[in-house]
Amino acid sequence: HVIEPSAGADRATLAFLCEAYCEDEAPDENGNLQSRVVLRLNPRLAPIKAAVFPLVKKDGMPEVAQDLYRALKKKFNVFYDEKGAVGRRYRRQDEAGTPYCITVDGQSLQDQTVTIRDRDSLEQVRVKIDDVVSEIEQRVLPN
């Protein structure tokens, strides 16, 4: 008799994806609950660690967002998106499993802070632009 165990990356990947897939409800831009698909991958396993969005494509927000994107890109696989409403951009990243979305808005231009949104809790916190890389690093690679 021959025992031939099989344990490949395919099965582990499928197990992670099946465990992470979730459908829940979250408020849209108008405060109405909408169904959303979320890939709740552990931040260490998520292929894209963060996404950077300017709230609108004017008033200097894209330039600030692109600078932040370039700074994050040095340490992490990050995504930049400026197409469509910010709520839709959040939903696209939720589906892709991106744990954190960073939004540059009007307040960012005044006080040099951005909003970091957590995919799982939907919590949003303001963080100084200069601290974003270390903040994402602490969240993605906790000690």
Where does each model-flagged region fall?
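NTP/phosphate- and nucleic-acid-binding module
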Residues: 1-143
